[in-house]
């Protein structure tokens, strides 16, 4: 649970530490829930170039790494697409198989075009205006990363 956009961003930074090349993160949440804010934290931790904003109209922002031997970040907002077939028609499904980290806002709209082993994040509104509840689901075989992330959140490891 976070109490501010800054806290949501900080969770994104911690989350980046368990991501690997070719990871796909499917994000869901209502408009204004904090999906782009979370991506900003991931981008900061990955040390990529450019300001993070929602690619609502362009559908995809590719943030190249600012340093050698780092991963690019593929940031999608698929709200305007008509489903998995539209995602494939644009060739976006191929990007998820390239080296890099892929985060997809409104990812439930294109779930059928994604690999089975995606990490899922649902962001919902909490009991007050700034409170957000973040629920992560790691796929089978990645439980150890989910546990490491939980321990990071709890401050047990750094």
Language-model features: locations:
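Conserved lysine of the Walker
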Residues: 35
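N-terminal pre-Walker A segment at the start of P-loop NTPase domains
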Residues: 1-14
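P-loop (Walker A) phosphate-binding loop of NTP-binding proteins
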Residues: 30
């Amino acid at each position: 649970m976070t109490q501010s956009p800054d806290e949501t961003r900080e969770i994104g930074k911690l989350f980046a530490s368990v991501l690997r090349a070719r990871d796909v993160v499917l994000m869901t949440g209502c408009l204004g829930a904090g999906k782009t804010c979370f991506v900003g934290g991931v981008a900061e931790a990955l040390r990529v170039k450019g300001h993070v904003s929602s690619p609502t109209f362009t559908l995809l922002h590719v943030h190249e790494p600012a340093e050698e031997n780092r991963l690019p970040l593929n940031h999608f907002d698929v709200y305007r697409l008509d489903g998995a077939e539209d995602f494939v028609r644009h060739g976006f499904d191929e990007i998820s198989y390239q080296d890099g980290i892929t985060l997809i806002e409104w990812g439930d709209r294109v779930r059928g075009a994604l690999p089975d082993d995606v990490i899922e994040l649902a962001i919902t509104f909490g009991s007050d205006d700034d409170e957000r509840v973040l629920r992560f689901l790691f796929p089978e075989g990645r439980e150890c990363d989910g546990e490491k992330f939980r321990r990071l959140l709890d401050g047990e490891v750094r």
